[in-house]
Amino acid sequence: EGEDLTLEEKAEICSELELQQKYVDIASNIIGDLSSLPMVGKIVGTIAAAAMTVTHVASGRLDIEQTLLGCSDLPFDQIKEILEKRFNEIDRKLESHSAALEEITKLVEKSISAVEKTRKQMNKRFDEVMKSIQDAKVSPIVSKINNFARYFDTEKERIRGLKLNDYILKLEEPNGILLHFKESRTPKDDSLQAPLFSIIQERYAVPKSIDDELAFKVLXALLYGTQTYVSVMFFLLEQYSFLANHYYEKGDLEKYDEYFNSLNNVFLDFKSSLVGTGTSNNEGLLDRVLQVLMIVKNSEFLKLGKNGVDEMLNSKINLFNKIKEEIEGKQRMTLSETPENFAQISFDKDITTPIGDWRDGREVRYAVQYASETLFSKIGHWSDPVNVRERACPTLRMPVDQTRRNVLVFRKFDNSKPQLVGEITPYLSNFIDIDRDLYNAASNPDSAVGFKEFTKLNYDGANIRATFDQGRTVFHAAAKSGNDKIMFGLTFLAKSTELNQPDKKGYTPIHVAADSGNAGIVNLLIQRGVSINSKTFHFLQTPLHLAAQRGFVTTFQRLMESPEININERDKDGFTPLHYAVRGGERILEAFMNQIDIDINAKSDKGLTPFHLAIIKNDWPVASTLLRSKKVDINAVDENNMTALHYAAILGYLEIAKQLINLKEINANIVSSPGLLSALHYAILYKHDDVASFLLRSSNVNVNLKALGGITPLHLAVIQGRKHILSLMFXIGVNIEQQTDEKYTPLHLAAMSKYPELIQIFLNQGSNFEAKTNSGATPLHLATFKGKSQAALILLNNEVNWRDTDENGQMPIHGAAMTGLLDVAQAIISLDATVLDIEDKNSDTPLNLAAQNFHIDAVKYFIDQGADINTRNKKGHAPLLAFSKKGNLDMVKYLFDKNANVYIADNDGMNFFYYAVRNGHLNIVKYAMSEKDKFEWSNIDNNRRDECPKEECAISHFAVCDAVQFDKIEIVKYFVGTLGNFGICGPLHQAARYGHLHIVKYLVEEEFLSVDGSKTDTPLCYASENGHLAVVQYLVSNGAKVNHDCDNGMTAIDKAITKNHLQVVQFLAANGVDFRRKNSRGATPFLTAVAENAFDIAEYLIREKRQDININEQNVDKDTALHLAVYYKNLQMIKLLVKYGIDVTIRNAYDKTALDIATDAKFSIIVEYLKTKSGKFRREYKSSYGEPSLLQTNKISSFIDGKNIEHDHLQFINADNESSQLFSDTVSNIDVIGTLLLVDVLIRYFSKQGYISKESDSASDGITQAAALSITEKFEDVLNSLHNESVKEQVDLAEVHGRVYAALKSGRNSRIHQILCSSLKSISTLKPEDMEELVSVIMNSQSSVSLPEVTDSANEAYGEA
């Protein structure tokens, strides 16, 4: 139950259970932490595994359940194997890339990361998708995708951890994986391209509805397959790039060219397949998949409401567009032209042989390569050989490249390894081959020969600044070879900046000298004033770090002679040179400890000291050396509060543990954080019995120490099944009834564990088998509810109480039923048959729990024993309902045969037949219809009477309605086509209502139902009201009457208008709607739009259908559209109507103009607007000479400074409960910011008076308009209270109202306070006397408007949330 699981399998189980310590960290996060390992350089797998697993386990609570499941049982061998594979991979990648491949490598690694991240997430669930696809056409296609993806992942992982030579052999196998993956883009039957294009062409991945599970599963397969396809391309690019680089480093330029060429061909081939060739008839795979995604995204059924599908589609569209853009942006991987070798070779220099590689009788050849920005060509053919005779360092004459590219020059003697010897820049034609020889001379380990050759070449003009391998110069070369004569000469020739010149990895010459142990060179460079503490680029290592890890004592001493040296300098991860010296050995450590300024307990970023590292390294001599300083803190803790003893316990280092325990200052009971685990806890957790036994016997170890959750070492010993440790604990008298915080005893844990034999051991020790946890569970409860059959039977054989109930009123029999432990259930029933029908607090019986969890054998056993087959729990769930919902026809038949009540229903009125219909189980539906002696669908069903209030409806009515509503077309076809039930539930009307176009088409085209139906409301009415444009279009195109009456004397366009479906209105308007026709309310479509506050529709009708409407028309009460807009306080609509010339003087049946109505109702903003008829308030500024301007200065007051809210509205907004006295005390120093903040408070204060109540879940547009107007009017009240006309005249209240309305309507309610604040931005600061009045209005104003809620989220705007 965990012992045989792989690391990945266990990670999957534990992460799915959503346990606090997600085990998947071990397989992924640990690997991701390699850059911060507590050692430097290559680390053996054991140390890496230990350090990383410690960090991850110690960082979270040791949860009992996860530990029992093995989620904290760390398999070191597997982790070491993973780490070793990753180290091999890193080693390969650390090989230097040729310049030609660096950019390609960056592109590939970046793209792989983006694609593989989401592909791995999909991979976890793809097996489930495969298992659930039963469709005969689709299943084989999806299987091909699955098979290929599995093969790809398996092979990729298999080669990942190979050693270098094995890796090369595997990649170069004839007809091997590279060839197979290259063919994945061909139409071959076993390729990946074939099934992907098949899915696209057959439209298998385009769902017909939100419930089209098959199509959505195929869509997941298409996306998964496409991402795999892209991954294959990048994998191939990565491998060919690696092979090319490998052979470049080996000097095999023919092989380099071969793989360099393959690299480009793979890219171009896959690019053609993925993004096409740019012609209209050759679309790439990505374009086709994006088209499918857009079709699904624009489906009508996805517009009905928010769901996760839309989010998923958007993320995939973004991903594939990004990939497409990346691929399209790269025209090719290499320059297409292979350079011709036009070099003319002449020996013009007076440099005689032998010198360097120039020896008489050897043959020398040259080859060139073009370089243009980030693109490189293949390396051209080698020139004809030239025999070396007495002369060296020839001049190469080449024609100037017309395209102004750089030319890299390579040289090869005989069959030796080629070398890059230089670069010819544009416009130059002559190249003297001398600089590489100077570099080689500086690199010569024979210092005398090297110095002689260097002197000669330097005299003849060689460039000491030329760069070669990894950007290194002769300075680096001399530093590495240790040629102090050359370096001495160079120090006089070079500038100080050149002595500090870093290579591509940041290594300066002194880094190289220190890393090579060349103390003399180090000393020379220090004397010349180089930067002693300079750092490498990635790891930020100083020369001292490098000398320390190599153990070079003399080099260390020379470095320490510099007064500038920082002995405690930290690298990228916070490690000091002393940390590195742990790897260098005892002598270098002693040298460090003799230094006065050394910080012997220095901590890395993770809190690790050198002593920690010595223990992790299992190196007691090094640890002893540190201890001799008498300054080591042996109890120092890292970031997880882990001491050196913790690490020894985790890694199982018994001898180290003994040494540590014997130290006088040791504290063996320090606990980790936040897990609170001691060294003893860890030794048991990691199953190091020898270390655990030693610690248990140690007098200074607390054997009863509690970790987080109250877990003691005894609990862990049970969880991990450590029998030897348990025996030792019993012998030393450990209390066997220890309880965790949740009151788990060791026996509880044994009952849940994978070691049931421990139960008898504890029972023999007298353990209390009736002990209860906080939830009231006994050991028997836990054994049954955790599915531990053997444990439960052992407890039952010891005559434990099987009738105990837990906090849910459940007995062990309920647990056995829930987990399907048939043998345990049989044992309990044989002891006590009265528990057969016993109910828990949810009224669930064992039978019902077994049924709800689909344990068929247990269900049949309980029924055979006489259990109530019609048992129902508090929600009405019953066995028959469970199996029908699941689609288990055999069990439905079984329950029918056992005379189950076939009409039994749950609290929602749902019986087995409805569940079968809603879940698309046609086989169960057909079976039920065939059992007429037991089930009759014509029976009246009052369980769902609220859905059929006007009459009593039969099961058939609800069943047909459900089939249509839940888009189960096969069941619809059965009910309507096979059984001929055309009239039940009005299937065409229902299909139109819910927007199921394919069902509408079926009923019209195959069953020949009339598109106008047989009811008052036509299908077109339903589709229009619910905004199903595609259905509306189909019905009209098939002859539906657009002016046919709906209920209430309305037509289809009226229905669409009432729900503000503009697109439907536009379509109907273009297809013969009678705009003069009035409904039962005497309103035309135009008046209906105004009355319903459908602004967009009203604007459309006025702008686009002006010839069909009369803007001044009146209803039965002689009201015009303007009257109606005033009634609803819709200022936005009023502005629209006035703008397009409505007659504002028309009077209604009560002799009132629109202005009269606004005046009577005291709608001041509307009154002001209608009076001007211009829709604009006065904006000209009129200064008030008689009284001081209310808002003039713009100083930042002490009030704002004191409150620290100068630019922070939110902090002030949330201070709703401050009293008016607070405002009075502070108004004397308030300014512009304060004014705006007070407006924020104003809005929140008003809103709490209930502008929008919580009486309903939605509101009409008119309600929204009213709420917006009420807010604006209160805002106006505040401005009026200021007694300053200039303030009011500068604020356009009509504009404010429109913006507030728009914010409410769009759901952006949080913007309302910003709108009102911005309206005051042009106004200066409030004066104290006026602020008093403003505060008074804010505090005393009461809302007089109580309106229904606009939306649930509208509360946010008013401070109710």
Swiss-Prot record:
A cellular-component GO term for this protein: extracellular region
Ranges for the ANK repeats: 470-501, 505-534, 539-569, 573-602, 606-636, 640-670, 675-703, 709-738, 742-771, 775-804, 808-838, 842-871, 875-904, 908-937, 951-983, 984-1013, 1015-1044, 1048-1077, 1081-1111, 1117-1146
Keyword Membrane on entry: yes
UniProt feature coiled coil, ranges: none
Pfam families in the record: Ank (PF00023), Ank_2 (PF12796), Ank_5 (PF13857)
Keywords attached to this entry: ANK repeat, Cleavage on pair of basic residues, Disulfide bond, Exocytosis, Membrane, Neurotoxin, Presynaptic neurotoxin, Repeat, Secreted, Target cell membrane, Target membrane, Toxin, Transmembrane
Keyword Disulfide bond: yes
Tissue distribution: Expressed in venom gland, cephalothorax, and abdomen tissues from both males and females.
Region named Furin-like endopeptidase recognition region: 1176-1179
GO biological process terms held by the UniProt record: exocytosis
Maturation-removed propeptide residues: 1180-1361
Location within or outside the cell: Secreted; Target cell membrane
Post-translational modification note: Processed by furin-like proteases at both the N- and C-termini.
Region called Helix H8 is the probable transmembrane region of the tetrameric pore inserted in the target cell membrane, residue ranges: 218-237
Disulfide bond entries: 393-1046
Major location category of this protein: secreted
GO MF terms held by the record: toxin activity
Free-text domain note: The H8 helix is predicted to insert into membranes and form pores by assembling into tetramers. The helix is contained within a helical bundle domain that undergoes significant conformational changes during pore formation to allow exposure of the H8 transmembrane helix and transition of the toxin from a soluble monomer to a transmembrane tetramer.
Note, other: Is the main neurotoxin responsible for the human envenomation syndrome known as latrodectism that results from bites by Latrodectus species.
Family: Belongs to the cationic peptide 01 (latrotoxin) family. 03 (alpha-latrotoxin) subfamily.
Summary of the function given for this chain in its UniProt record: Presynaptic neurotoxin that causes massive release of neurotransmitters from vertebrate (but not invertebrate) nerve terminals and endocrine cells via a complex mechanism involving activation of receptor(s) and toxin insertion into the plasma membrane with subsequent pore formation. Binds to neurexin-1-alpha (NRXN1) in a calcium dependent manner, adhesion G protein-coupled receptor L1 (ADGRL1, also termed latrophilin-1 and calcium-independent receptor of latrotoxin (CIRL)), and receptor-type tyrosine-protein phosphatase S (PTPRS), also termed PTP sigma.
Assembly: Homotetramer in membranes.
Protein name listed in UniProt: Alpha-latrotoxin-Lp1a
